Amino acid sequence: ASFTNMATLSYNGSQINSNVVTGELRDALTITKTAVSGGYRPGDTVTYVVTLSNTCTAALTGLTLTDDLGGYTAGGQTVYPLAYEAGTLHYYTGGTEQTAPAVTAGPPMTVTGVTAPAGGNVTLVYQARVTEFAPPGVEGEIRNTVTVSGGGLATPLTATATTAARLEPELTISKALSPAVVTGNGPLTY
């Protein structure tokens, strides 16, 4: 967003206006979310990377990150196509892993006590398991939104990662031999 400003000078009944200056307002905190996955099937695990970048000269503390785990309404109730995998949160400040803040698995998943350092970034990496509520098929996708709030932010910030359903079949093959021990020229069954 941009803004403009002009000054007015008044003296002895005269008035003069200055030139108009234009500036740009940038968000002090930005958020991105990425799904590290080529698609999903029920039971798969999807890794998410959330990065908060702080351009302020002061750290932003007391932030809360809320992941909606892709929740949507079906049949009058909210269902969740993702479930946070406990113990998978990794928390990096400036690229160095730190002790992870408190996590509530939810749904929704909530991480409290997040700090975005002055002029730096914080990255959270975690995994979620795909549940039976994940939409299958050609049009199937999970829209997973994360919101950051608190820490003096005027309004919450959001970022969304979309992951599509994998359509290729999951094939397996196995072969067995009977009997396991065969004498010379004896019969085998596969």
Predicted segments, located by residue:
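Exported/extracytosolic protein signature
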Residues: 1-190
